[in-house]
């Protein structure tokens, strides 16, 4: 399968093709081989292989803490933005499998990390937050978790924070309005996030 993927490397690979490739591998290999295979794929210089590896690790990390640790510590420092998009999807895969309420300690752990890519895997991966079980019934918890990083030094992360809050404002405008009214808009970082989060508010 690796060889067949290699033939397609010059072409920009859509995310859904990566997901299809992961499903094919998961059905073709014994589960005990997945982790080593994912590590081998992640060592490849072509980002498509690392995207595929990240997807596989996300499936494994639902039950395998070594895979979860690799996602957090190694995948998160990959320089390719596409790999970081797959990390966000992988994190959501883990939370979906374990249950979003049961995953709250894990969500908070990642949100408290020093690496903005780890934090963004949460803020971006769980979008739209209030369509997820638990957060659908508890939008205020989602808003509080996301809003913690409104002033983060990473513009890349603040953009994700603002967009995630804007998503929620479509159904919970008053909750978002209450949140952003407390923000210190003289801080240019917070103002940047505010403009995204409050974009749909009247």
Where do the protein language model's features map onto the residues?
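Alpha-helical scaffold domains
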Residues: 4-202
